[in-house]
Amino acid sequence: GVSSRARRPPGSSRSSRRGVTSELAWTTHPETGWEEVSGYDEAMNPIRTYQVCNVREANQNNWLRTKFIQRQDVQRVYVELKFTVRDCNSIPNIPGSCKETFNLFYYESDTDSASANSPFWMENPYIKVDTIAPDESFSKLESGRVNTKVRSFGPLSKNGFYLAFQDLGACMSLISVRAFYKKCSNTIAGFAIFPETLTGAEPTSLVIAPGTCIPNAVEVSVPLKLYCNGDGEWMVPVGACTCAAGYEPAMKDTQCQACGPGTFKSKQGEGPCSPCPPNSRTTAGAATVCICRSGFFRADADPADSACTSVPSAPRSVISNVNETSLVLEWSEPQDAGGRDDLLYNVICKKCSVERRLCSRCDDNVEFVPRQLGLTGLTERRIYISKVMAHPQYTFEIQAVNGISSKSPYPPHFASVNITTNQAAPSAVPTMHLHSSTGNSMTLSWTPPERPNGIILDYEIKYSEKQGQGDGIANTVTSQKNSVRLDGLKANARYMVQVRARTVAGYGRYSLPTEFQTTAEDGSTSKTFQELPLIVGSATAGLLFVIVVVIIAIVCFRKGMVTEQLLSSPLGRKQRNSTDPEYTEKLQQYVTPGMKVYIDPFTYEDPNEAVREFAKEIDISCVKIEEVIGAGEFGEVCRGRLKLPGRREIFVAIKTLKVGYTERQRRDFLSEASIMGQFDHPNIIHLEGVVTKSRPVMIITEFMENCALDSFLRLNDGQFTVIQLVGMLRGIAAGMKYLSEMNYVHRDLAARNILVNSNLVCKVSDFGLSRFLEDDPADPTYTSSLGGKIPIRWTAPEAIAYRKFTSASDVWSYGIVMWEVMSYGERPYWDMSNQDVINAVEQDYRLPPPMDCPTALHQLMLDCWVRDRNLRPKFAQIVNTLDKLIRNAASLKVIASVQSGVSQPLLDRTVPDYTTFTTVGDWLDAIKMGRYKENFVNAGFASFDLVAQMTAEDLLRIGVTLAGHQKKILSSIQDMRLQMNQTLPVQV
């Protein structure tokens, strides 16, 4: 029978005599040779056969040719022959010319053009396939045994072919001839469909069959292809598909069927669909995520397979303990945490009128311990509050929030407590001044206490003469004013003076002792006092001389150390062993007296040598890992403690190298430590050391409590003053100035790579993309040979186009960081694609100023984004500019507006036209402040005319307490007023 991989070409007649009972009429030559006869097969079925038995005559050359067989696309043909052969020894009285073999030939032709005499009956034009010999021959006619042989030939190129059989003197019968070819049947493998494919021209040929993903599947590796071998079998699969998100495998991985109701699949893959997590549902088939039910939400960081959760209920059992102008609040956790474990608390302080009808947020003088930073919240259920004023009425709201509170349209649940502070003594007098002095008196004044905590009744002044080993007898006087005249003093004498204020609560603390001196009797000061400037000047000059000498000694010493360091490194050894003048000249440029030079750890033949040279080895017994706080490229990031001998225990961040690492991964992991270990600056993350002599391998750095700058700003939207933000930017610029002076290019400067500690100090981190910058005055760039990804939104155009990374490209990135900081962590270029960003920057589009951004800061951003990198400011200039802005705070009050020109706004981000909204609620939804819709309605602000007249006090009164939200709503109200003025009718 015919196998599943073997069939005749479509539309052609099978070249077979098996089972044929009608006359075949094949061509014979000569006519006395092959003879067509009827016979029976093994099952005694009637068949037509060809036989020949001219064994008694020598020089036989009998040919038999089939009819024309269409080839179509087949390149190699297989022929199965069934035949019987008579044993020559069993035939009596025959000459030695008797044969027991015959020859198989084929002839290719584009048309059925063969005739009785054409082509010539000979090898060439006929092509010989093989000489066919039987496995068994028979000696008696009735016991003939059928032989089966299969031969193949190719490659074929014409439209068809003939088969021919040559007899040279055998006694045989040709029972069956079957021509066929082999193919690989269509199949599904790896969720891809591969079509039916014919085998190649040779038995060893491999034919490539391209595949396509089955419906609802996606490619996971390309190209998709299978190889069909010469036996018609598939082999060597390349590439694969997998079921798309929302679909699962079915029918033995031959189909991808949609997830049913109540199930979902968030990622592509071969896994099955999963039931919806609690509090969620699907609305259609093929769901990739289950939608949260009403009142339940997911945080942005929650995975799609996590349960939907709700906001927590209000804290319970608030207890207050008031002590004069400070208090302690304690409370119990909410009855319902909302199904989450990231519960936090916000304490809102409000100062109220006597009737508590009008409350406003407390000013910044009120201190909280632990300190509250915007929306980061408290984890402890206890807070100490100090520096509140005496007597006023206060209301404290303790809000319970969790990771999805920002998703809820309603304000957090809270418990409130009303507090009336007690009378407290005044604070200390900060400073005192000498107004005039005579031989027996002096007139003093002072600044009133910063916190009087009530009406000041009078001041008590204590003074005593300063003598050799101590002070004399103290005298006290009182004054109703913040000034006093002290009489009865000695001439040319020094006195120590202190002052304190008194209220009905009693005296406050004395001020710090301050020294004042009376004049001589003749009105002149003493000789010692007159010579004081000369003495001070001489001492200062002497001190400066000593400092200069010490600095010169240090410079010379460091110069020798740097030179020795360079010469002992692989870079230096290369210099000593090289006669290349260009190399020597470059190295000399690095060795600048008094300047520390960065050395690329990748120049070391042994990377471990760089680690030993620049990083301190720490014993594992000194390290204690407390919790995992994240995951990095090489392993986990943990928080822990470090206790070195002779030093106090400190919190540290610990990067660990995952198990099963390769030597290259270990080298790349430790290279960051080799880089960080060379830096020593308050705005660069500090390396404590490494652990390489035990497992796991660790890099230990200082711990930054507030983590990455971008997420920190988003959590504290609108909570900082402009001066605070500029201070952060100044710290980042100072760190980058330090790196650029060491000829070091960061290449990945972004807010996500700036870490913030508890004191809001920003430090540059993440040196994974950084590389050494060669100091070549002609072209001070590092040409990257890496093919890795680069952060398009933060990278300078020349670095994207030509992989030219310089300190100037870092300046471009710093401008983007400025924009991130002033926009409180907004994504640069918003939702534009990377290619759109590249095109826009190429067309001189630049980011517009963030909301409420000072003009001076946005201009500095634009300076950083100048196309010509040589015209961008240096980091030293940026630091100087920011210092001037900090000293002249008034310059930061001029707010930037979007202007046209070369550096025009990237996108039209104007506030929506309020006339397009039918209700105030629609307007609040448009500006993403829909959570306050109920507040506006309950307070009576139901029309745009009323909303346009609202002030910050109105927002506070109706419950909009977050400063960032107040600023956003007021900004939109201001635009609403402008639109109303533009649409007023004009009287003619």
Swiss-Prot record:
Key words of the record: ATP-binding, Cell membrane, Cell projection, Developmental protein, Disulfide bond, Glycoprotein, Kinase, Membrane, Neurogenesis, Nucleotide-binding, Phosphoprotein, Receptor, Repeat, Transferase, Transmembrane, Transmembrane helix, Tyrosine-protein kinase
Tissue: Present in 10-day embryonic brain and body tissues. Prominent expression in kidney. Lower expression in lung, and barely detectable in brain, liver, heart, skeletal muscle and thymus.
Active site: 748 (proton acceptor)
Domain Fibronectin type-III positions: 311-424, 425-522
UniProt keyword Kinase present: yes
Binding site residues for ATP: 629-637, 655
Modified sites of kind Phosphotyrosine: 604
Modification after translation (UniProt): Phosphorylated. Autophosphorylates upon ligand-binding. Autophosphorylation on Tyr-604 is required for interaction with SH2 domain-containing proteins.
Domain SAM residue range list: 915-979
Disulfide bond residue pairs: 53-171
Superkingdom of this protein's organism: Eukaryota
Pfam families the record matches: EphA2_TM, Ephrin_lbd, fn3, PK_Tyr_Ser-Thr, SAM_1
Membrane topology, Extracellular segments: 1-534
Membrane topology, Cytoplasmic segments: 556-988
Catalytic activity: L-tyrosyl-[protein] + ATP = O-phospho-L-tyrosyl-[protein] + ADP + H(+)
Subunit-level organization: Heterotetramer upon binding of the ligand. The heterotetramer is composed of an ephrin dimer and a receptor dimer. Oligomerization is probably required to induce biological responses.
Protein name: Ephrin type-B receptor 3
Gene for this chain: EPHB3
